[in-house]
Amino acid sequence: MRSVLIGNGVVIQHGGAGYFNANIIQRALDNIRAESHPAHLYPEECADFVFALAKEHSAALNGYYDNYVFTTYDRVSLTDFKLRYDSTRKYSATEIGFEDYFLLFELIHNKLGVTNPERFNSRCALRRMFLDAVFNKGKIESVHKQFSVGFVKWLKSHNNILTTNYDSNLDISTGLPVHHLHGSFNTLSEVYDPNSFRNQLEDDFLNGEKVDFDYPHLYSTCLVSYVGDLKSHSMTQSSLANSGMEKFVEGYQSNPDLRKQIDAWDESNDLVKRLKEAILLKAEHPELEHSEQYPHKLLRKISGTLEIIGLSPNNDGHLFEHILDNRNITQIVFHHFGAQEAADAERLFSSKNLSTRDVRDFWLDVNA
């Protein structure tokens, strides 16, 4: 069996420099300055917010926010963050990784003690601004027009196509199922789906918000996070919730004592009230379940050869952990951009049968 895991490098190869991190951030700022953004979905203040966060970048590098880290994954993320930047120099707003802005966001909000719903709403606006910049007014969905016949043929030679990209260029060019590990611009998030399990509950989780279908990509399943553990959590939470709910309902229906306990739960607590309502609703409508929108299990199931192209060995560690744990992957072919990436890949996959290849040679061959 042959599988391939594809990252943003493939979009950059065919779509150009506009999909580099710096240009995505610049486009986000330019969209706001030109008033060519959906202001009702993310306000113009988002641009000021980016610059305010960027001003704290140096402070975060030099330990100022160390005491405002309250979770293990945030601490790990901050350590990694410090390793990726030079603490002796200043970085412009476009030199900071756009996902790192979300770490800075959390650190500052921790320091200021800002909580939900203000924190949630601000994070959501920041996410929409960056996703809109990646989407590039839909231009990203046309990148496949630059794919060569040879590249498409190579893609089709694989049994499984997996990607961390949000766009549908691989889907369109091959006509095959593509597994979007971090979500897709074209898939509505369960949060905004009126037919989803969570939106059948009495409480209005969306607080009356209506989806603007002129901008479906801003309501999509795309994962944007500064830490792989949070992406991994988002990828697995639906399956875990379904498993837990099945156990609750089974106990509720088969154990009279547990049924009495659940029926007597104090509904003055919103979380308890929602859980109780969900159990009763699931018991009455067993077909209801949380949609599993991320194919997170696939990396544990594939076998044979896995080729990796367009990804850095220093990002998406949560995915590489699944690959390392999968004993049925007998060979990894890592396409690198330069000697440093090759060395990093060899260190990362030292326990695997690994071969490396310069991605520039790959493109010369496949496009010939």
What are these regions (language model features)?
Residues 42-128, 138-272:
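Extended, H/D-rich, highly charged conserved domains that either
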